[in-house]
Amino acid sequence: MAIVLRTVDFSETSLIVTLLTKDLGRISALAKGARRLKGPFEGSLDLLSVCAITLIDKPGDTLDLLTESKLRRRFRGAQRSLERLHAGYYIAEMLRLLVDDDDPHRELFDMTLSAMGMIDGEGHVAKTLLAFDAQCLRLLGHSPATQRCTVCGRDAERSRRRASFSLVGGGVVCENCRPSQSHLMTASWDALDALRELASEPELPPSTIDADTDNPSQPPSTAFPIGRLFPAMTPAIYRDLRGLLNRTLESLVGQTPRMQPFLPDKLDSL
C-alpha cells in the first residue's frame, strides 16, 4: 500500500512519483507512461491517492520502476472545501520533509491514513492537523518534552503563567536553566497539556487491534483512531499550540513549509 505524496514530470509520457509506503517508507519511482491519457496506472497517481503498487527495485542511484498501481481510495477533500484541500497538501508536504527515504514507519502510515480519512470526511480539520503534527513528532522520535526540563531533567515548576520552550532542545526549560538557553519561545501550560494528549499513543478498541489497513473497504481510522486523541481546548489554546507546533517543525526541517500559511487560523474550522 502507498500514498502518493508528489508527482514530477520526467518526460512527455512519464512521471517521477514520491510515495509513502507502509513497508518501505518514503520512496521515489519512475512511472513510465503515467502521463498518457490511456496510461497503465488508471488515474491512481493523483496527489494523496491510496494505491496498491508493484515495484521493480533498481540497484544503486537508479530510480525504482513503478510497474503497476491500482487505486484503492481517492482523496476528495477538494470537493468538500478549499480548507480540506489545503490540509491534504500540508500533510503531503510534511511527510516529504520529515520522513527519510527507505525508512519504514508502519504506524506513521496508519496514522496518515486516519488523518486523511478525517479530512476527506466529516472530521475536524484544525484538530486533525494538530494531532497529525504531534503524532509525526512522536512516531519519528521528536516528541516534545512538556513536563521535564530538557536541560537538567527535573520537573518544570509552573510558577509562571507561560512556560519557556526550547526549539533546539525540543521541550520545556525550567526557570533555573532558562538564562543559559537560546532559541526559546513561550507557550501556555494549557497548550502544553493539550500537546501531551495529542502526542500520546491512542488506545485501540479490542475489536480493532488486529485491523488490516491493506483492506480498502475498512474505515481508514480503524488501525489508528486519531480522533480519540482530540483534547478539549479553547480558541486561545489552539492558537498557542498551533504556533508552538509551527515553530517546532520549522526548527526541525530547517525551513517554513510552503503550506503552513494556509493552515486553519481558527479552532472552529471544519
Swiss-Prot record:
Highest taxon, organism lineage: Bacteria
Pfam families for the chain: RecO_C (PF02565), RecO_N (PF11967)
GO cellular component, one term: bacterial nucleoid
GO biological process assignments: DNA recombination; double-strand break repair
Region annotation Disordered: where it falls in the sequence: 202-221
Keyword annotations: DNA damage, DNA recombination, DNA repair
Xref: NCBIfam families: reco (TIGR00613)
Family, as annotated: Belongs to the RecO family.
Role: Involved in DNA repair and RecF pathway recombination.
PANTHER family assigned: DNA REPAIR PROTEIN RECO
Protein name: DNA repair protein RecO
